[in-house]
Amino acid sequence: LNAAYNMNTPTIKTDRLILRKFLENDIEALFLILKDKEVNKFLPWYSLKDIEETKKFYAERYAAKYEQPQAYAYAICLKDDNFPIGYVKVDMEEHHDFGYGLRKEFWHRGIASEAGKAVVEQVKKDGLPYITATHDRNNPRSGNVMQACGMKYCYTYEELWQPKNFLVAFRMYQLNFTKGQ
């Protein structure tokens, strides 16, 4: 690959969306996504209480990743205003975990699927061997997004979920990019 090629959250445009890095001046937008109890019900953190918590979350989960040679940690923005309404990410750790979240008022419009498909294409192009994703069995719409992105259901497992500390049945999906798998 060309050394100048950006493998850290390169901007992607789709029909309706701009997928880009979260910026420091997006803290308020990030807070709107992360404060909603319903949006965060099935995510591995509690909804955030204030801007200070959001700044810390941004520093740990976005700014730190943007310093790495390769990362995929996107703000989902509508093309109209380029204002973050959600996020989509693929981790660089071994499982290459694929995840997303969207403000409630933007649910049921195919936005998570549109953003997810675009990021899946990007990580495939950039040479990731596969991605995985899990969803709580009680959140089947998240599984619909995984399927829309081409992922295949593998199995269900139970886990005492942290930090929320209750038993969850997770459905695990995977999508392999390398040939012969």
Per-segment meaning from a language model:
Residues 34, 43, 65-67:
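Hydrophobic residues in alpha-helical segments
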Residues 38-60:
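Conserved GNAT-fold acetyl-CoA-binding loop/helix
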Residues 46-50, 72, 138:
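Short, conserved alpha-helical segments within structured domains
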Residues 53, 59-62, 126, 169-171:
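Juxtamembrane helix-loop transition sites at the ends of transmembrane segments
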Residues 61-75:
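A short helix-loop-beta-strand connector motif used in the catalytic cores of GNAT acetyltransferases and
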